């Protein structure tokens, strides 16, 4: 740490170099990804626009039809306007206007066959402990890899696993 009065401070952190072998990066994983075999429709509800755009791109590339909304109120409107089935709701848990849990509860009444996957930047234990989500509910903590998301989706929708490249 180096500091000068009215000039600020600088911090230098030295980390050891990683000498192991690297795993496949998300970019490499995405390049090798095979599209899903089905034509399922997913309603993606995420209040962070950058995350919503990235997930939409990934899921479309993987063969899914994507409906999207940036909050629960908008998601209810999108779902009501969509005549076909919605196979999966992927929703952030903590959002303005309406939580992901309340959204899911309302949509399941209208679409009882729809599956739900909750995503959040909060840890699963904290969410369950606070009563925000029931223990055992399908949940994926952020950040997550493309592969982890696709595996979870395939499991929830009973799709065959993504082929390995």
PLM features: residue spans?
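C-terminal end segment of the histidine kinase catalytic
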Residues: 1-42, 49, 73, 115-118, ...
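Active-site residues of response regulator receiver
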Residues: 92
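Receiver (REC) domain active-site loop signature in two-component systems and cognate sites
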Residues: 95
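Acidic catalytic/metal-coordinating carboxylates
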Residues: 71-74, 99-103
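Charged docking surfaces used in two-component/phosphorelay signaling
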Residues: 53-61
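Alpha4 helix (beta4-alpha4-beta5 surface) of REC/receiver domains from two-component response regulators
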Residues: 102, 106-141, 146-155
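Two-component His->Asp phosphorelay active-site signatures
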Residues: 47-49, 145
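Acidic, metal-coordinating helix/loop segments flanking the phosphotransfer/catalytic sites
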Residues: 56, 68-88
């Amino acid at each position: 740490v180096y500091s000068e009065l009215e000039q600020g401070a600088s911090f230098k952190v030295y980390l050891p170099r990683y000498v192991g072998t690297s795993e496949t990066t998300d970019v490499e994983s995405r390049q090798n990804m095979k599209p899903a075999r089905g034509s399922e429709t997913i309603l993606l509800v995420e209040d962070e626009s950058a995350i919503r755009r990235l997930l939409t791109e990934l899921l479309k590339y993987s063969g899914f039809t994507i409906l999207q909304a940036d909050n629960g109120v908008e998601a209810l409107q999108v779902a009501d306007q969509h005549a076909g089935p919605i196979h999966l709701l992927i929703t952030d848990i903590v959002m303005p206007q309406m939580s992901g849990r309340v959204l899911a509860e309302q949509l399941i009444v209208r679409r009882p066959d729809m599956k739900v996957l909750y995503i959040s930047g909060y840890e699963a234990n904290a969410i369950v402990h606070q009563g925000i989500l029931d223990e055992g509910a399908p949940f994926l903590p952020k950040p997550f890899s493309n592969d982890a998301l696709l595996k979870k989706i395939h499991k929830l929708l009973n799709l065959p696993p993504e082929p390995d490249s």
